[in-house]
């Protein structure tokens, strides 16, 4: 049965069907798992597995490197050790602990998810059920349901697409990663080890993160290299995904300090990305007294934008502030939630004044 499914799946999707049958797929699965059990990174959410730890790690790992996540995960688990404690926390405390990880909607959605979980009579176990929670998409729902409950659902993200595109030397061009993951879903599901779906998914993710890298893949130590068609030519050429040109953006911001108080802007609660977070205000929103003086410029990237942030020393009309702008005593700066870059800029500038 599996052989028929594979032939239909691979023939329909790729031209490079090369004798894959049930035996070859089983060898792929076994080689992958053997490598994973022997070489996997010892990560806290793997060493002490729990549903809550799995959910937290999946939220944190969205668009963020493992090395960055590790200290945040450890602090989070100490402060909010389970769904109930997290559900009872103030959002400001949740955002403060998340500070520096970016993409703060993840923290708010995780907080909302915890509140919903504690109200349920039983914990959901299927991918379909987890898809109903805020912030849980196709990838996270498959990861959570397979790792925590052994549901046979394959994960598909950019790492997984890269592995299978190279495995079959996929010549198709995709408009973006989203299209590639959608078209690879049936194929990756056909390769899933249904006896150990959670470990299989983690093994594939581990392979993409540590061996089958976007640049300079480590083909010589890859556990499944012997069945990879791209390994002998140009593996870096796969997958073929069109890259959008990054948009150049310039943002001018005010650093205004008066009577030991710093002017900050607080995003409203209905803001799409940074709700409730404080930041240095934009010059365009303020009434400036005199001529601003450039303090420094910083380059950063958010999604598809390349942003040049220019920070100016400015004098502000203190009694005529627009909505959402507040004077915050520098002694209390640590207490307000800010994004990582803004926190770093504020600390740097205040330290220069001492």
Q: Language model features by range: what are they?
A:
Residues 16-20, 31, 35-220, 224-234:
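Catalytic cores of DNA base-excision repair glycosylases
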């Amino acid at each position: 049965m599996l052989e028929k499914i594979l032939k239909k799946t691979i023939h329909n999707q790729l031209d490079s069907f090369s004798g894959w049958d049930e035996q070859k797929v089983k060898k792929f699965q076994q080689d992958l798992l053997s490598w994973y059990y022997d070489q996997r990174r010892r990560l806290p959410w793997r060493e002490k597995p729990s549903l809550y730890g799995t959910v937290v790690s999946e939220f944190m790992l969205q668009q963020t490197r493992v090395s960055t996540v590790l200290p945040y995960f450890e602090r989070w688990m100490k402060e909010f050790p389970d769904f109930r404690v997290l559900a009872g926390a103030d959002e400001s405390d949740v955002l403060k602990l998340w500070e520096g990880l970016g993409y703060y909607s993840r923290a708010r959605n995780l907080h909302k998810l915890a509140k919903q979980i504690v109200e349920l009579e039983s914990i959901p176990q299927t991918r379909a059920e987890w898809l109903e929670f805020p912030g849980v998409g196709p990838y996270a729902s498959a990861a959570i349901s397979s790792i925590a409950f052994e549901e046979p659902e394959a994960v598909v993200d950019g790492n997984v697409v890269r592995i299978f595109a190279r495995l079959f030397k996929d010549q198709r061009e995709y408009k973006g990663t989203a299209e590639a993951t959608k078209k690879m879903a049936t194929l990756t599901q056909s390769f899933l080890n249904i006896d150990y779906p959670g470990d299989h998914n983690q093994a594939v993710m581990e392979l993409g993160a540590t061996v089958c890298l976007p640049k300079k893949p480590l083909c010589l130590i890859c556990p499944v290299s012997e069945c990879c068609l791209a390994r002998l030519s140009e593996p870096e050429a796969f997958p073929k995904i069109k890259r959008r040109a990054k948009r150049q953006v310039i943002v001018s911001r005010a650093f205004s300090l008066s009577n030991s108080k710093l002017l900050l802007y607080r995003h409203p609660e209905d803001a799409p990305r940074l709700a409730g977070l404080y930041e240095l205000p934009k010059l365009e929103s303020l009434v400036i007294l005199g001529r601003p003086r450039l303090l420094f410029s910083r380059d950063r990237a958010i999604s598809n934008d390349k942003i040049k942030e220019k920070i100016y020393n400015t004098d502000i009309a203190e009694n005529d502030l627009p909505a959402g702008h507040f004077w915050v005593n520098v002694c209390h700066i640590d207490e307000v939630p800010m994004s990582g870059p803004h926190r770093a800029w504020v600390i740097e500038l205040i330290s220069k004044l001492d």
